Amino acid sequence: IQPAPADVPDIIKNILVPINAQKGDLLPVSAFKGMEDGTMPLGTSQYEKRGIATHLPVWDSSECIQCNMCSFVCPHAVIRPYLLDEKEAANAPADMVLVDAKGPKMDGLKYTMGVSTLDCTSCGSCVSSCPKSGKALKMVPTHEVSLDQTGWKYLQTLPEKNDRIDKFTLKGSQLRQPLVEFNGACAGCGETPYIKLLTQLYGDKMYLANATGCTQAWGAAMPCVPYCKNKEGKGVAWSNSLFENNAEFSYGMCLAVKQLRAAVTEFVKQLDGMTKDAAVKAAIAKWFETYDDLDASSVATDELLAVLESTKFSAEEQAVVAEILKRRKDMSKKTMWMYGGDGWAYDIGYGGLDHVFAMGEDVNVLLVDTEVYSNTGGQSSKATPVGAVAQFQASGKKTRKKDLGLLLMTYDNVYVAQCSMGANPNQLIKAIKEAEAHKGPSIVICYAPCINHGIKKGMNNVQQEMKDAVASGYWNLYRYDPATKKFTLDSKEPTMPLYDFMKGEVRYASLELSFPENAKVLFADAEEAAKEKYEYYKLKSEG
């Protein structure tokens, strides 16, 4: 076994390196000391550095418009934009390309694009999604690119410029650190960009219950954990239970977090009634004012903790302060999310999902819909559309896709959105923001192309496939807000023939070869289903 560098954590030296060398069976039980309860350190994927790319993206700063779309769509968080102030730019490696940052609030800042070359999978999604594809970014054979990581390592030390950006924009979101990186998903994966975006918006305040399936396989393949922490040591509190109980598992997490916060709140109230210190009372007042505001609550909590740690109290007051400080991690508002695929949400875990939503708690779901059981090889699910070929549906699925969004709208308190990243990134960000802000259950259903679809143009065109799915009426974009009872249809009337979209994927095109008569009937039904669905949504949006 090739030894690990001396400056890496013990888990890398003692566990990751031996396992990746196919020597995991030789590990003694003592190697797992401290992990008896199943917990694992975050961020171990950054040490793998597999170096599997045959081609790498090379950035041309003179052609770049700094839209950050390349970073937005990257399935493995390999390509990222950075902002540098004058001092940081002066200390940067001499060969690092820096240009003036464009946009509001960017005065005095430099902009660069970093690529973690040893973590890239050569999918090419960045290049195919670039508005100036072939100019601002090009895929170049790996042997022609420097693999030196000095520049990348320097960029990881830089603080974020959060006061200069709006994280709820495509460009701004990508100037925040992704808290899931270098995962084990397929090259070009359609699932991972969604969860990466979610971590960039809320990752340092997020609890995540992950259903079994592909999202668990690439998110927790022992010993590689792609979920990581920011420079403050905060990251996604991630866990997985089973396929069939993820919603219930998340509900339990939600109730536990709620109870823990209620406990510390009682101590804060008690201190407020005891102390006469004006600074302490002001900090407590602000903490209560921002109690339900995710971002403001975090700031107010830090300010209150700073005041508590710097103020002299009486012995009686200090006893209460000690109880508060002991529970400091429970003080700020957290956001609760479930994450999984259609095999979980439409099928195996649907009963639990329905039950949890009926309870009315403030839980959120990010559902990546690949329309098959992806992790186990492409078996048909209730999300599989009519006419698609999948395992157990070799002659084409005879029934139409279950409309999970409409089913959940029958509850009067559930926020529902349907999104497709490549079709409308801004609608996706808006939906996630609205879902998190909704005081009750919410679900964001995301179209996620998969290798099981057999995209003829290749997995480097996943984002275009998302766009074509909407343009053809195969997939619709909408948002439903139960607070206002408003249904907003965000996709326009189809401009692309549905058949043109379907024939571009092997899961449909193969049916014409193996069962041509079935294809004729089922594709006609698919056309009718798409037309009916759009007309129904259109009527619903018109009130």
List where the protein language model places each region:
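Glycine/aspartate-rich loop-and-adjacent alpha/beta segment that forms the canonical ThDP
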Residues: 1-4, 223-236, 428-518, 525, ...
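Ferredoxin-type iron-sulfur electron-transfer modules and their immediate structural context
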Residues: 1-120, 127-336, 388, 451, ...
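Alpha-helical scaffold segments in soluble metabolic enzymes
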Residues: 69, 125, 196-200, 263-266, ...
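A structural signal for short, well-ordered beta-strand segments and their strand-loop junctions
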Residues: 75, 207-211, 367, 418, ...
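Short, ordered loop/turn segments at secondary-structure junctions
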Residues: 84, 142, 368-371, 421, ...
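Thiamine diphosphate
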Residues: 218-219, 317-442, 455-472
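C-terminal, charge/polar-rich interaction regions
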Residues: 521-526, 531-543
